[in-house]
């Protein structure tokens, strides 16, 4: 069997990171960050990430600011991002797509939808 695909989960709430890893199972390798600043620092040293699951509302650097940074360094062209948030406002969701997110998953999580969307995005890249 080949190497596991690597998913970075960026969320300031550890419980949300744990839930996502539990939903997705041991099929993937995981890297965790508590905010966009930490995630960007990690990406500067390791671009072998296959997918980023990115929360919007976080301290230090939020999800939108991280997407802007990823655009600046052209990482957004290489690493797909799925935004995760409980936010339902259309303008927030649209902003995620405009900044380069491939998809948007709302909390509370539906396990089937999370697994399917993650697999669909990974199959495209």
Could you describe each region identified by the protein language model?
Residues 58, 70:
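Receiver (REC) domain active-site loop signature in two-component systems and cognate sites
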Residues 91, 109-118, 122:
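C-terminal output helix
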Residues 59, 107:
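A Lys-centered signature of the CheY-like receiver
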Residues 13-31, 44-45:
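Two-component/phosphorelay signaling modules centered on CheY-like receiver
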């Amino acid at each position: 069997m080949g190497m596991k695909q690597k998913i970075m989960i960026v969320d300031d709430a550890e419980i949300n990171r744990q839930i996502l890893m539990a939903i997705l199972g041991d099929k993937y390798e995981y890297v965790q960050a508590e905010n966009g600043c930490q995630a960007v620092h990690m990406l500067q040293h390791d671009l072998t990430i296959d997918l980023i699951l990115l929360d919007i509302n976080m301290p230090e650097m939020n999800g939108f600011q991280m997407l802007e940074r990823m655009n600046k360094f052209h990482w957004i062209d290489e690493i797909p991002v799925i935004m995760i948030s409980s936010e339902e406002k259309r303008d927030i969701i649209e902003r995620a797509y405009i900044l380069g997110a491939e998809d948007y998953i709302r909390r509370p999580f539906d396990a089937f939808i999370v697994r399917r969307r993650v697999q669909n995005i990974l199959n495209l890249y």
